[in-house]
């Protein structure tokens, strides 16, 4: 066989070996070569890429459209990452200038702009915003494959499983089920067992009172609706720079009738870190806080606990 033909054959074999295919919400995505310039449109993708040692070249870290920006725990880790708008308003122009070879989009948030994104670069639509912990674990593995870090991704998941197993040792057997909710100045939105935080808290050993409602993994309820549920344990995700609606509810007799309030089993965590990070790095912080807050132990949170 001629030397040039041998060289071409070898190159073809290398290219084939480097090709990778993953399933996503729009079908399957095949890359002819591993991604090196990734733009991430959700914080969970950023978290995962950083944990894998391959930070994105760009990410939607902005505050346009009312987004709160990068979660505090991620801020030190994304200083060199270009800002490509916000999750709600990604900048196609800024992304194009970065010449990405892969875009990671949220299946729920970015469905309308998926065609434009896929014209810029190969785009994987993953279930992040409305995903469970299992969905996010599958996401970690898919991202690992796309960037050539599958072994590292599998190790992350193995370490995570071991960490969750250790956390479950602290969980009190027979503890009553909880209701978990994101609280803003205007609303309280419960997170069911199908949401990320709702399923995570079950994975560390407590029982979520609320299953998925139809196709809703999270939905808004009133104080009256919360009292109708009357959970014995209440987990609230709030922001330190906001006054949550529950602050006003605390003067309402209905709030005082809640079993969780009467038992002293109301736990508060930073919603930016807990409900927006949704990646391997965030999970380590979350596990530590479920123990430090005494949530797992079904004991009153210590006065010194601060999220």
Which role fits each region the language model picked out?
Residues 64-68, 112, 126-143, 175-198, ...:
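Extracytoplasmic ligand-binding site segments that recognize negatively charged/polar headgroups
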Residues 14-18:
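N-terminal signal peptide c-region/cleavage motif recognized by signal peptidases
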Residues 37-52, 152-206:
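Basic- and aromatic-lined ligand-binding clefts that recognize polyanionic substrates
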Residues 24-26, 84-93, 213-223:
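Short helix-initiation/N-cap motifs at beta->coil->alpha
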Residues 43-94:
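A short, structured surface patch at a secondary-structure boundary
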Residues 233-307:
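Structured C-terminal subdomain patch of bacterial secreted/periplasmic proteins
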Residues 92-105, 122, 226, 230-235:
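Proline-aspartate-enriched helix->loop->beta-strand connector
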Residues 55-56, 71-77, 145, 190-213:
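Ligand-binding cleft/hinge of the Venus flytrap
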